[in-house]
Structure formats: C-alpha cells, structure tokens
Amino acid sequence: MRKASIKRETKETQIELSLNLDGSGKYSIDTPVGFLNHMLETFSKHSLIDLEVLASGDVHVSHHHTVEDVGIVLGMAVKEALGDKKGIRRFGYAIVPMDEALSLCSIDISGRPLLFYDDLGLRGKITNFDFELMEEFFKGFTLYSGITVHLKALSGKNLHHIAESLTKSLAVALRQAIEIDPRRKDTPSTKGSL
C-alpha cells in the first residue's frame, strides 16, 4: 500500500496527516478552519485518497498559516507515498462543474513543482475564509509534492462554488495520475526517473 504519515510543527502550526493513495475516499478531518475542513473532505472523497488530518494553528492571527501549512504537509505526504513512482499513469486532467462554476486541472507528476493558477481574479470571503487562501493551499501542495499543476477557474460567480470546483478538479486529476497502470512496469519517463 502507498501510505504516508507526516507530523510537522512550527511556531505557527501543528499538523499530523496520514494518507493512503490506494484508499476509497474515507476521511477524518479536524482543523480550526471550517472551510478548509470542507475542502479537504471534498479532496479525499473525489481523489479516493484516504485522509486523516489533525491540525491546530494561530488562527487568532489569520487562517493563512494553517491553510498553507496543511497544503504543504499534504504535498509532502503525497510525494512520500508515491515513492519511486513506478507504474503510475503520471498525467491526469479534469474539468469539473459546481453549479455555475467550472474549473480545469491538468497535472504532471514530474518532480518539477510548478503551479499555474487562475481564479478569475475574484476576491472575497466564504463565511470567514478568505478566498485567496485557496491559492496558498494549492501552492503549498504543489511545491512540496513535486507536481506540476495547472489549475484554472473557467467561469463562476459564487466563491464557494469556485473553490469547490477547483478542489474537485485537482482531486479527480490526481486520482487519474496516481493510478497504477497494469501495463507499465517502470517509471513513466524516458529519463528513467521522476
């Protein structure tokens, strides 16, 4: 089984995260940021990655550190669980609607962490959650997972719907890319490694 458990503590956050890439989308999420919990549950459900997250942080200052650091730890765990990446499909893509919102995600598990992100330039709050923190979450995930991620909101007006559409599109694309291809016995690269 491709699993990982990461514990990361800083002066700003304390995070414990475990995942199973070969799961069924089971989750147990406990952070002090309600909307982040919702997005992590959505991510787990649609990627089929079993996910457990226990996090605390300096949310009296801002949600920023907790949201970004959970993204970082999730990226670290995905990278660790992928191991040598033998047999994976490597690429994944999805276009996912959430009511009026539509988002596209295309990923390459390349070992080259790059995020190309477009949220239509929208800003505002989802309850008490700053919408622009979605980019910080995705940036942390991308940099520490070693994955190239193109993530683009194509349309939408409701910030909750856009955030959820972005998260679901990443989850579905990642589900495809981490899947083991029974025909592939080696690492999916002409270089021989990723």
Swiss-Prot record:
Gene3D superfamilies: Imidazole glycerol phosphate dehydratase, domain 1 (3.30.230.40). GO terms for cellular component: cytoplasm. Pathway: Amino-acid biosynthesis; L-histidine biosynthesis; L-histidine from 5-phospho-alpha-D-ribose 1-diphosphate: step 6/9. It catalyses: D-erythro-1-(imidazol-4-yl)glycerol 3-phosphate = 3-(imidazol-4-yl)-2-oxopropyl phosphate + H2O. GO terms for molecular function: imidazoleglycerol-phosphate dehydratase activity. Keywords: Amino-acid biosynthesis, Cytoplasm, Histidine biosynthesis, Lyase. It is found in: Cytoplasm. Its EC number is 4.2.1.19. GO terms for biological process: L-histidine biosynthetic process. CDD domains: IGPD. Pfam families: IGPD. Belongs to the imidazoleglycerol-phosphate dehydratase family. This is Imidazoleglycerol-phosphate dehydratase. It comes from Persephonella marina (strain DSM 14350 / EX-H1). The lineage of its organism: Bacteria, Pseudomonadati, Aquificota, Aquificia, Aquificales.
